Amino acid sequence: GVWSKFTTEVGSDRRGMTGVDEKTLKEIGNKLTSIPQDFNSHNTIKRIFENKKNMFSTGQNIDWATAESLAFATLLNEGYPVRLVGQDSVRGTFSQRHAGITDQLTGDKYFPLRNISENQAQLEIIDSLLSEMGVLGFEYGYSLSEPDSLVLWEAQFGDFANGAQVIFDQFISSGEKNMVTCKWFGSTFATWV
């Protein structure tokens, strides 16, 4: 099935090549921090993007949100789809991500991560409803059918994961173990943030 390419022989090296050269990182960084000239972004957003541009040009003081965007962008650039879902995933709960920005005059949205290259993989960043169990259950199921995708579910705050506890306990934690006896369970590369 779709997971067979991820199996390795017992004792074989499971490490993959994960490095990205500096030139590519800087090119991607430039695209992540570029806003179209005719786009009327908020002054605060302009300042944030200028700070990020400086991080990429100097290689200094790269913060978590910038490193996260760079990680997503390199995966997209290599052909791996990225799907991030949570209550405030586009902006980021602490206003750190700004994966999508809004034109202050037209209301149009711009997603720098969707503009890395012409041949990049699909990016989905979705602000979900406040129904942790339903959303996490869906994302878990989605991750089972899309093994080449990075699927992430983000709890807006850590304790919000409590509302999805049944999914963690009955599906995710026991999924691989029960894979042998139950046909609907299986491996997942999904990430719970």
Feature locations, PLM:
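Flexible, glycine-rich loop/tail regions that form catalytic "lids" or insertion modules at the edges
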Residues: 1-193
